[in-house]
Amino acid sequence: MERRLHIVSFDVPYPADYGGVIDVYYKIKALADQGVSIILHCYQYGRPEQKKLENLCEKVYYYPRLKGIFSALSREPYIIYSRRSQSLLSHLLEDDAPILFEGLHTCHFLSHPALSNRLRIVRACNIEHEYYHYLAK
């Protein structure tokens, strides 16, 4: 049985030089070391594409973060709505492998009807509602 996993990351996880991406990068490395075939999806805003990730993953896709006023006016939180990409959805639909959404940031397609038959896992990085509550003060 082939072990394959989609990982949707809120940022490019290499170099592993700050909290959230450290966790994502070393998770990818550990899973790859165990023979899991990883299809990595990264939202990109300021961090360049990384060849090192291509050595660990079967495929690596990069998507722009959609910043601007229209993303800010959504009913969905900005950190989620600005990370929406129809290309991501298309790539997720190419197979039936499980999907790991890294952080609430990446969950725009979590409840999409086309993914209803898929195993979908959300790994919360922080207690997000408390984190943003205190940032707002």
Question: Which role fits each region the language model picked out?
Answer:
Residues 90-108, 121:
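Short N-terminal targeting/anchoring amphipathic segment
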